[in-house]
């Protein structure tokens, strides 16, 4: 009887274990299926050619997978490599904080204590002796993006691109501060590029080697690397995603721009590797048995300075998603986009790596996908709806057709306009001619308008890449407007109205 009883207990225990595992597996399958349905639906709605996704909770990977459109010739997997752009800044901040904990860097020491060659163009507003401003910029200022430097005083994307970290530091001798150090937040890529050079000098290792030894290898990020330039990224990556641009809601493959990246945007990674990074970030700086630095350093990196109005910590923005504190950062290149968000309260982490970028996607699609995933994690159901980038493309195409039609109609009306010159007040004639040149004038000054609004300077090439359909529409309007305006000026010059005025 005792033997039979023991056999029954063993059978029931095994049944409970099997049932538990089955329910767990079924639950995981339901979760994965829900994620898959949501992502594929969003990709179809917004014509996204490919993305890779990693979701973690506590010290577990919940989901890691690559997704591709049906007609994609370069299928995306969890091992596909992406340029993660400005998400790289948090890795640079980790390197600095490791050296701070090793007492090799002092956050409040001047940058010049480590890089004597660090020098800026002294601004006239400061009314201080030459060399005073750059001598006051500290390591903490660079990390918090409050160095006083900005794209307005140093439009680095429009200048000759450095090929080494040392060249980037010396190129800042042309940079004009726009604020005193510590006074105000200005997002400025070279802040983190200077920090990369500080890491090199203090550690006596090339920056890429330092990251590999002290961050990538301990976190088992085997397919992750740091590139100094875009060309280095292509040479170093063995499975790089094909980047894309978008026009009128339609994606097309296009090479990424060349340029300098290291320190601010040079890391190449995969969804699989980023899952390990998310676990490290949401677990107080620990991954499995590896602890890269203290919990206090993680908290400091995630916390904006209190002395000024800023949401930027050290490589991270602090915000909110669905009413909950979120630590996040995106990464933007012309053909790649990355979204990383940490929910510290519940220890969730999400990394989205896209092989496409365009302003409509940044404004509409990418936020919808990020928010939908967060809602799916918290409520089990993502939000639906939102404006489709495909509809946006149709709307812009229609707007372009209407604009071109009206411009051609105006050109065809020129003979009648010429005859009406004598019956129209001269000021109205000049006003009408001036209006024809407005699109061209607006197109010319657009980079400075963006700089005024966003504190970032993007030249015409970058603007064309980021919003190709809008820029094409504006360019066509500008060309037709200039042709119209020149024709009217010629007609006016040949009339006797100008002779009468003179």
Where are these regions (language model features)?
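Stable alpha-helical elements in mature extracytoplasmic
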Residues: 31, 35, 47, 51, ...
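Short glycine/serine- and small hydrophobic-enriched flexible loop segments
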Residues: 97-101, 196-201, 276-283
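Catalytic-site signature segments of enzymes, centered on catalytic residues
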Residues: 129-130, 151-233, 239-245, 249-275
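Active-site helix/loop module of the DD-peptidase/beta-lactamase fold
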Residues: 50, 83-87, 99-150, 174, ...
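Hydrophobic secretory-pathway targeting helix
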Residues: 2-27
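Short, conserved catalytic-motif segment at the N-terminal edge
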Residues: 28-84, 120-131, 173-175
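Catalytic tyrosine of NAD(P)H-dependent dehydrogenase/reductases that use a Tyr as the general acid/base
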Residues: 82-85, 185-187
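Catalytic loop of the DD-peptidase/beta-lactamase superfamily, centered on the K-T-G motif
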Residues: 26-51, 55-57, 255-502
């Amino acid at each position: 009887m005792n033997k039979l009883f023991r056999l029954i207990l063993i059978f029931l225990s095994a049944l409970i274990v099997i049932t538990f595992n089955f329910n767990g597996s079924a639950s995981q399958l339901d979760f994965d299926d829900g994620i898959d349905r949501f992502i594929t639906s969003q990709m179809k709605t917004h014509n996204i050619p490919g993305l890779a996704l990693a979701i973690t909770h506590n010290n577990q990977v919940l989901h890691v997978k690559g997704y591709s459109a049906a007609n994609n010739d370069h299928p995306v997997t969890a091992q596909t490599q992406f340029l993660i752009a400005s998400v790289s800044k948090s890795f640079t901040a980790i390197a600095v904080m490791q050296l701070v904990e090793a007492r090799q860097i002092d956050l409040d020491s001047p940058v010049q204590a480590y890089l004597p060659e660090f020098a800026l163009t002294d601004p006239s507003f400061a009314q201080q002796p030459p060399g005073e401003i750059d001598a006051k910029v500290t390591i903490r200022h660079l990390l918090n993006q409050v160095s006083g430097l900005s794209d307005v005083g140093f439009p680095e994307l429009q200048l000759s691109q450095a090929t080494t970290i040392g060249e980037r530091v010396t190129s800042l001798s042309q940079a004009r501060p726009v604020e005193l150090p510590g006074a105000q937040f200005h997002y400025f890529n070279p802040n983190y590029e200077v920090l990369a050079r500080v890491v090199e000098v203090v550690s006596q290792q090339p920056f890429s080697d330092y990251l590999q030894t002290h961050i990538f290898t301990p976190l088992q990020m085997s397919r992750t690397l740091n590139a100094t330039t875009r060309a280095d990224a292509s040479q170093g990556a063995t499975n790089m995603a094909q980047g894309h641009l978008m026009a009128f809601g339609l994606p097309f493959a296009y090479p990424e721009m060349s340029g300098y990246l290291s320190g601010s945007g040079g890391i190449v990674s995969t969804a699989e590797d980023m899952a390990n990074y998310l676990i490290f970030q949401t677990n107080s700086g620990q991954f499995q048995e590896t602890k890269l630095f203290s919990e206090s350093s993680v908290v400091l990196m995630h916390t904006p300075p209190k002395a000024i109005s800023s949401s930027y910590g050290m490589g991270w923005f602090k915000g909110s998603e669905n009413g909950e504190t979120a630590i996040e950062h995106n990464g933007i290149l012309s053909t790649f986009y990355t979204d990383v968000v940490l929910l510290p309260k519940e220890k969730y982490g999400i990394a989205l790596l896209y092989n496409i970028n365009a302003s409509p996607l940044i404004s509409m699609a990418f936020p919808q996908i990020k928010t939908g995933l967060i809602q799916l994690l918290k409520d089990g159901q993502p939000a639906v709806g939102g404006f489709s980038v495909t509809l946006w493309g149709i709307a812009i195409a229609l707007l372009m057709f209407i604009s071109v039609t009206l411009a051609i109609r105006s050109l065809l009306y020129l003979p009648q306009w010429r005859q009406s010159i004598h019956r129209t007040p001269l000021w109205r004639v000049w006003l009408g001619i001036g209006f024809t040149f407005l699109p061209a004038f607006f197109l010319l000054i657009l980079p400075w308008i963006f700089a005024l609004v966003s504190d970032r300077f993007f030249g015409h090439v970058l603007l064309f890449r980021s919003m190709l359909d809008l820029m094409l529409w504006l360019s066509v309007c500008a060309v037709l407007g200039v042709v119209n305006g020149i024709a009217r000026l010629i007609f006016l010059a040949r009339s006797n109205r100008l002779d009468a005025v003179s």
